[in-house]
């Protein structure tokens, strides 16, 4: 969901490091001061970053669509885009799959996606919650499930627990998500991202925008929620629920998660299935 882009205007609280034993390291203090300090130089730098980002906006989530398209599963019958927003990713997946389903809990988002993709018979859009969809479609026939900036809107443990039942053997889950900064590596990645963000904006959107970023006239506003779970918590949940999952910290305030459901392997010739042997 494009609105979940912290960029340089993110709330200072997301950058705070909790004190341990009543003291902070020099690095921790620096991280806090960069975001919260009333120093005129730092205040000016933050305002400059905000102005540059506003003049040269770009979509953090769509930036990772290429990663998704480069990691499609071998079998491509059915794909489900959870939290499809206005349907941009669902439209990009359509040429690669026999059918694509986009779901969104927000009525305005689902309506916008439906209007965008109304002429594509390969794509269907549903206005429903993920839990409802999973309960109705848990038949293990989906080859790809994508979630872009949506997992932090859902219950982490419950959502990950439902994935194996939805995916076909050999199916794949691809997540681009947001996590709460809670460690020095998190803060370092966020500081680098905040610095690189305007550079990427200049590259991808060199012509200054005439107006501040936001939805186009008549377009619904993306639902926004700050992430509550840390990358360490997400990794632990994925390890428990989806053995073999790969979680990686990325630039531009994102992480990626990839998991492949194990394929069904045929037993060797002459072997017996212990569950059915009498």
Mark where each language-model region is:
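A conserved beta-strand element that flanks and buttresses the S-adenosyl-L-methionine
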Residues: 146
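Short alpha-helix
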Residues: 224-243
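Short glycine-dipeptide loop
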Residues: 167-172
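A short, conserved alpha-helix within the catalytic core of class I
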Residues: 154-163
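Class I SAM-dependent methyltransferase SAM/SAH-binding core
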Residues: 86-132
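Conserved class I S-adenosyl-L-methionine
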Residues: 77-85, 174-203
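Conserved alpha-helix/loop element of class I SAM-dependent methyltransferases that forms part
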Residues: 59-77
């Amino acid at each position: 969901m494009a609105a979940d882009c912290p960029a340089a205007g993110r709330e200072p609280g997301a950058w705070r490091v909790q004190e341990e034993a009543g003291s902070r390291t020099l690095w921790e203090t620096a991280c806090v001061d960069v975001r919260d300090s009333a120093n005129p130089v730092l205040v000016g730098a933050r305002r400059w970053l905000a102005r540059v980002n506003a003049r040269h906006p770009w979509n953090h989530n769509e930036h990772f669509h290429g990663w998704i398209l480069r990691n499609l599963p071998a079998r491509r019958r059915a794909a489900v885009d959870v939290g499809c927003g206005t349907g941009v990713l669902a439209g990009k997946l359509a040429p690669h799959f026999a059918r694509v389903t986009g779901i969104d809990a927000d009525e305005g988002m689902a309506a916008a996606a439906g209007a965008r993709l109304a002429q594509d018979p390969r794509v269907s859009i549903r206005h429903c919650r993920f839990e409802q969809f999973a309960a109705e479609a848990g038949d293990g026939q989906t080859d790809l499930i994508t979630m872009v900036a949506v997992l932090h809107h859902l219950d982490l443990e419950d959502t990950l627990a439902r994935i194996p039942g939805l995916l076909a053997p050999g199916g794949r889950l691809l997540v681009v998500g947001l996590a709460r900064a809670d460690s020095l590596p998190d803060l370092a990645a966020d500081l680098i991202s905040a610095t690189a963000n305007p550079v990427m904006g200049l590259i991808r959107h060199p012509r200054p925008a005439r107006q501040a970023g936001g939805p186009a006239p008549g377009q619904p506003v993306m639902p926004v929620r700050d992430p509550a779970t840390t990358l360490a918590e997400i990794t632990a949940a994925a390890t428990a629920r989806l053995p073999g999952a790969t979680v990686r910290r990325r630039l531009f305030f994102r992480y990626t998660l990839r998991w492949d459901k194990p394929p069904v392997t045929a037993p060797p010739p002459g072997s017996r299935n212990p569950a059915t042997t009498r």
